[in-house]
Swiss-Prot record:
One of its GO terms (cellular component) is membrane. Attaches the virus to cell receptors and thereby initiating infection. Binding of H protein to the receptor induces a conformational change that allows the F protein to trigger virion/cell membranes fusion. The cellular receptor might be SLAM, and may explain the lymphotropism of the virus. Residues 1-37 are intravirion. SUPFAM superfamilies: Sialidases. GO terms for molecular function: host cell surface receptor binding. This is Hemagglutinin glycoprotein. It is found in: Virion membrane; Host cell membrane. One of its GO terms (biological process) is symbiont entry into host cell. The keyword Transmembrane applies.
Amino acid sequence: MLSYQDKAGAFYKDNARANSTKLSLVTEEHGGRRPPYLLFVLLVLLVGILALLAITGVRFHQVSTSNMEFSRLLKEDMEKSEAVHHQVIDVLTPLFKIIGDEIGSRLPQKLNEIKQFILQKTNFFNPNREFDFRDLHWCINPPSKVKVNFTNYCESIGIRKAIASAANPILLSALPGGRSDIFPPHRCSGATTSVGKVFPLSVSLSMSLISRTSEIINMLTAISDGVYGKTYLLAPDDIEREFDTQEIRVFEIGFIKRWLNDMPSLQTTNYMVLPENSKAKVCTIAVGELTLASLCVEESTVLLYHDSSGSQDGILVVTLGIFGTTPMDHIEEVIPVAHPSMEKIHITNHRGFIKDSIATWMVPALASEKQEEQKGCLESACQRKPYPMCNQTSWEPFGGRQLPSYGRLTLPLDASVDLQLNISFTYGPVILNGDGMDYYESPLLNSGWLTIPPKNGTILGLINKAGRGDQFTVIPHVLTFAPMESSGNCYLPIQTSQIIDRDVLIESNLVVLPTQSFRYVIATYDISRSDHAIVYYVYDPIRTISYTHPFRLTTKGRPDFLRIECFVWDDNLWCHQFYRFEANIANSTTSVENLVRIRFSCNRSNP
């Protein structure tokens, strides 16, 4: 007997086989016939293939036709280009050669003939008198029977252009980097170090004179765009054999050239020697545009007369070109032209510059106009706070109770006009030190930096912005303040105290560097250590930082003169320094002139 499960399994297995057999029979039955829709699909596929073949054939034909057309056009263009090339070679090149020959040889000859014709006609109509081109009003309305002669003027202009052309290669080697910054970049996060070195002057005229035991009493130096100028009083030992006086005035000018190891060297190219007379005892200096200019007087204080009652003293004008024996070497005495309210000017050690053929200096001046305004500024400031200057009863450099003003001296150097010294004045921050004003060129077009040196360690000096244009203004820049008690345009210089620093025997002039960013330098003769030293202070007011570097001296003495002039060379600070001192042991006066270099570097920089 089979169990229930065996029966059930047998039943389902048999049933499954029966069903499978039945299905296979059905499939074989349907496989013998094809449905009509399958034939329709095959027909559509055949038609599509034929259509694609037809489209491909048409596109291939079009591409072949386009390629043939492009080849034909390209061949035509190449034939035309070849024809143009032959036309240029065969026709235009000989034509250009003919034109060049005509312009190079015939045109100058024709122009010379026209020039000679004009000169002949001019000489014919103006037969009697020579004409000085510097009288410009004669050009506009010339007098009758005046012979026009442009020879002197044209020669002067031609010489200036030739000198500029000859000097340009020398200046190009010196100018790169002349206005770059000397300080480490802002990203410097470590300590800033300075390294200094002293270099002797080897090819300068003054150094050759000093080496012959001649004594230089004082020296002014100015440097501008690769050119330097000097003036100084010289007392050589053998002067009795050459001049009747005990001192001679020397002017020299030259280039700053690259020397060994790319260091700067002051090479003299032209100089002038004058016997020290009544007009060359005190001289200023200005350098620029390959020219040196100087104003010389007998006494520092020059009285200005505006009527016939007084005899106006003249001022000696000296100009010197970069190369010798040229019209720029000139000596002439001129009568200054000043504002009627001006009474005096005070000329001492003044450094100016030449720009647009105009030499400009700044000097202390005394004017009667607007005195009450200046006095009111000081009185209002002193009412509530006793500033050290409030107790002054005499004002430098003229003395008395009148406050000095700022005077501007301008001297046009254009060959087309006569030499004329113009003096104007204006007021600005109160002047406490009347010994010297310097004027430095500014990147701004119509202004410069006017500096007044410090004094006795109590007066820090002044740096103002002074205009060069018709409107002469002096605007405070640094080292001044506006008292709260005063109103209007009232500024006072910073005065620390009345206690004199005994360790600082003398302070130099205040120098503004020719960098794009505002920087200034000052030097002092310091005896605070066992070795005497000249200490340089370099200031960056924008970043409110300053750096110092001392140069130790091998000698000791009491200095009576210290003057510096600084410039930038290969991103380093270079300064020409001249100082005189009386030796403690020998009791003799010694003059020292040299170059110093200060290199600033950063120990660590941020990336």
